[in-house]
């Protein structure tokens, strides 16, 4: 009895054909008719910095800390979303950063969908830097805040004079955004 010899090239081709033939019934099983899930609407895009007005209100003070609402109003002309903590730092009149940026406390993050004209807010806490020893803070008056909306790389400046530390201590904390 004489068996034909196959070259490695022919052997590989035959193996590929056999595998393909074996997979055809398996592929057919995967395409059995089944009800499809209803299509879900895509969520609105993230809010671009250029489409937001950033402003503050509701300042209240207790035991050495001032709390304010840091607000984000969507004026982009369409719905958009915010999720997470804004980036916040004190700035000089010339726009230079003063001291450390605001800390982000651990918190549950929620996606906030803003219709055009709607506002989301984040609570900003600023420590009265007068409570720190003079050498631990190097206090100056900030001209305002540089604010990066969550997940954005472009900032807005918010005029807001307040006492800031130029070195050392973290003196601000900002919560994640939530619906107003």
Question: Which residues does each predicted region cover?
Answer:
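Terminal connector regions
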Residues: 129-170
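Short, solvent-exposed loop/turn segments enriched in Ser/Thr/Gly
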Residues: 63-69, 139-142
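Asparagine-centered strand-capping/turn motif at beta-strand->loop junctions
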Residues: 70-77
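Low-complexity, acidic Ser/Thr/Pro/Gly-rich terminal tails and inter-domain linkers that flank the onset
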Residues: 39-62
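C-terminal region of N-terminal signal peptides and the immediate post-cleavage residues
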Residues: 24-46
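Intrinsically disordered, low-complexity Pro/Gly/Ser/Thr-rich segments with frequent PxxP/GP/PP motifs
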Residues: 103-130
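Short, hydrophobic/aromatic beta-strand segments
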Residues: 77-86
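N-terminal export and membrane-targeting signals
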Residues: 2-19
